[in-house]
């Protein structure tokens, strides 16, 4: 089963093993994922389960969204997420919690990276700076040439240049689940995960560990 869960990044801390080894971990709160729709090949052309988390005021929900949540008999959430499903059955209103994962399991975590605004090539692409002296003036952090002359007469697509940095979908693969706290609905994942504290993250079984 490749289904995952939607959680909220709480921040980072560290825990110690019995041998005294310090392990940096990210704490992810797994609020109950309420199933809003179960899609099948007969009705939708593919198998998937759609979930929502959290709560949203009725004044912040459109009529279409309110009808969708009411049909599933679940409270309106702050969004909907979908997971493709190879096997298993779910019903609208079911709840998916942190017990889906076990300690030692490898997971992929997806989130939105922190926005950095408009960034230059040194910060955005790790370009080296130009000479500080030796005749260089006002060009210490500029990227330099961005192409050739009349042939080809254009800048190639994908050229690394200054621009907006961050605030994009990022996935970190094969992180180890160090601990599962079912009582408090917490996952402790080894290492860092994308995004700022309080941001939504999607935790799935690692694609490279599915065999």
UniProtKB/Swiss-Prot annotation:
Superkingdom per UniProt: Bacteria
Record carries keyword Membrane: no
PROSITE patterns: RIBOSOMAL_L3
One annotated GO biological process: translation
GO cellular component: cytosolic large ribosomal subunit
This protein's UniProt keywords: Methylation, Ribonucleoprotein, Ribosomal protein, RNA-binding, rRNA-binding
Protein modification: Methylated by PrmB.
InterPro entries according to UniProt: Ribosomal_uL3 (IPR000597), Ribosomal_uL3_bac/org-type (IPR019927), Ribosomal_uL3_CS (IPR019926), Transl_B-barrel_sf (IPR009000)
Residues annotated as signal peptide: none
MF terms in GO: rRNA binding; structural constituent of ribosome
Modified-residue entries (N5-methylglutamine), positions: 150
HAMAP family: Ribosomal_uL3_B (MF_01325_B)
Family statement drawn from the similarity comment of this UniProt entry: Belongs to the universal ribosomal protein uL3 family.
Xref: PANTHER family: 50S RIBOSOMAL PROTEIN L3, LARGE RIBOSOMAL SUBUNIT PROTEIN UL3C
Function per UniProt: One of the primary rRNA binding proteins, it binds directly near the 3'-end of the 23S rRNA, where it nucleates assembly of the 50S subunit.
Summary of subunit composition and partner proteins: Part of the 50S ribosomal subunit. Forms a cluster with proteins L14 and L19.
Protein name: Large ribosomal subunit protein uL3
Organism: Pseudomonas putida (strain W619)
């Amino acid at each position: 089963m490749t289904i995952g869960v939607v959680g909220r990044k709480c921040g980072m801390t560290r825990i110690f093993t019995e041998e005294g080894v310090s392990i940096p971990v990210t704490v992810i709160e797994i609020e109950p994922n309420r199933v809003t729709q179960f899609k099948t090949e007969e009705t939708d052309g593919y198998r998937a389960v759609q979930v929502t988390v959290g709560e949203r005021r009725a004044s912040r929900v459109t009529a279409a969204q309110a009808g969708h949540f009411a049909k599933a008999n679940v409270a309106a959430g702050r969004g909907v997420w979908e997971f493709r499903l190879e096997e298993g059955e779910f019903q609208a209103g079911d709840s998916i919690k942190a017990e889906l994962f076990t300690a030692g399991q490898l997971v992929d975590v997806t989130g939105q990276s922190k926005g950095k605004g408009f960034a230059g090539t040194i910060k955005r692409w790790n370009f080296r700076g130009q000479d500080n002296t030796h005749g260089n003036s006002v060009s210490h952090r500029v990227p330099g040439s961005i192409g050739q002359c009349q042939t080809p007469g254009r800048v190639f697509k994908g050229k690394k240049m200054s621009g907006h940095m961050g605030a994009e979908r990022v996935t970190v693969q094969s992180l180890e689940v160090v601990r599962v706290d079912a009582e408090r609905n917490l996952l402790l994942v080894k290492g860092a995960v994308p995004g700022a504290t309080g941001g939504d993250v999607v935790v799935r079984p690692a694609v490279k560990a599915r065999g």
